[in-house]
């Protein structure tokens, strides 16, 4: 499966992932809203939104 794997401040990149899922985490700090994408579906801290999916480049 192919997932995006970059933060919102970087140009889009992809990675082949064996985990079978992609994620998109979103949170806010002093820099504004931050978006991070990657492989798997990790647990997140309170205040961090996460959405996971299981198709190529889905998040």
UniProtKB/Swiss-Prot annotation:
Identification of the protein by name: Three-finger toxin MS1
Keywords of the record: Acetylcholine receptor inhibiting toxin, Disulfide bond, Ion channel impairing toxin, Neurotoxin, Postsynaptic neurotoxin, Secreted, Toxin
Tissue expression remark: Expressed by the venom gland.
Main location (coarse class): secreted
MF terms (GO), sorted A to Z: acetylcholine receptor inhibitor activity; ion channel regulator activity; toxin activity
UniProt entry tagged with the keyword Transmembrane helix: no
Keyword Ligase: no
Pfam families linked: Toxin_cobra-type
Gene Ontology CC: extracellular region
Role according to the record: Produces peripheral paralysis by blocking neuromuscular transmission at the postsynaptic site. Binds to and inhibits the endogenous nicotinic acetylcholine receptors (nAChR) in human rhabdomyosarcoma TE 671 cell line with an IC(50) of 48.2 mM. This neurotoxin is lethal to mice by intraperitoneal injection and to zebrafish by injection at the back of the dorsolateral region.
GO biological process, any: modulation of receptor activity in another organism
Disulfide feature: 3-22, 17-39, 41-52, 53-58
Family: Belongs to the three-finger toxin family. Short-chain subfamily. Type I alpha-neurotoxin sub-subfamily.
Subcellular location: Secreted
């Amino acid at each position: 499966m192919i997932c995006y794997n970059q933060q919102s401040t970087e140009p889009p990149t992809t990675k082949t992932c064996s985990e079978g899922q992609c994620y998109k985490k979103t949170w806010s700090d002093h820099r504004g809203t931050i978006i991070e994408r990657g492989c798997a579906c990790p647990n997140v801290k309170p205040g961090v939104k996460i959405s996971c999916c299981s198709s190529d480049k889905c998040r």
